[in-house]
């Protein structure tokens, strides 16, 4: 791994966590403590982070929350575009797909818009986009509106939300050899109910989330059919996932 790649991953860790220790950097990048401190010092000198005792802090900046209007500002946007394009190529004409919330989900929906596929979603920004673009087949899952996630959630135990799809595409805040993690419990529990009725589960996460644990375990690794991620993803974690039957696609 080059110095530039290490710096990129270190900054992505800070963007997600706000603070990292030297020990965490060593574990994540597989480097010596001396190299970790040297990387932190260089990025501190460039104003990219704030060096603190035994670690580093993110420089506080108000990052605008992404919307369909400023999607290009989403974190790791270019990598997410590649992931979405690769995911869209898995789906055959006439098939149905379940797409959940998030920037990668919106990018995937945008890729599929206009193709002869049925799109099932509870993510209102995506549903509104598909309707505005006159996509032929859109199913919007009903339920109570959740403002923080811009989604609808069905009551606990409701069977009305169990739409069977050939594919389910989802993402999360972290992916390890144990499985996929999500931080919003209500959203995760609503999506978990669908795992038993979809054909294949495909996880879409950028490389910064590989090896991270955050929130609750949404699905075990052996429940995941495929992972699509970036080329900088931790190879050790990918090997552990492959050993459990997960197909890996790096883009």
From Swiss-Prot:
Question: Where's the DNA-binding part?
Answer: 20-39
Q: The HTH deoR-type domain covers which part of the protein?
A: 3-58
**Major localization listed first in the record, in broad terms:** cytoplasm
Biological role: Represses ulaG and the ulaABCDEF operon.
Q: Which gene encodes it?
A: ulaR
Record's keyword annotation contains Transcription regulation: yes
Biological classification of the source: Bacteria, Pseudomonadati, Pseudomonadota, Gammaproteobacteria, Enterobacterales
Picking any one GO biological process from the record gives: negative regulation of DNA-templated transcription
> What UniProt keywords apply to this chain's record, in alphabetical order?
Cytoplasm, DNA-binding, Repressor, Transcription, Transcription regulation
What name is this protein filed under?
A: HTH-type transcriptional regulator UlaR
Q: Name one GO molecular function term.
A: DNA-binding transcription factor activity
* One Pfam family of this chain: HTH_DeoR
Q: Where in the cell is it found?
A: Cytoplasm
CC terms in the record's Gene Ontology section? cytoplasm
Query: Does Zinc appear among the keywords?
Result: no
Signal peptide per UniProt: none
Q: Which InterPro entries match?
A: Carb_Metab_HTH_regulators (IPR050313), DeoR-like_C (IPR014036), DeoR_HTH (IPR001034), NagB/RpiA_transferase-like (IPR037171), Tscrpt_reg_HTH_DeoR_CS (IPR018356), Tscrpt_reg_HTH_UlaR (IPR023711), WH-like_DNA-bd_sf (IPR036388), WH_DNA-bd_sf (IPR036390)
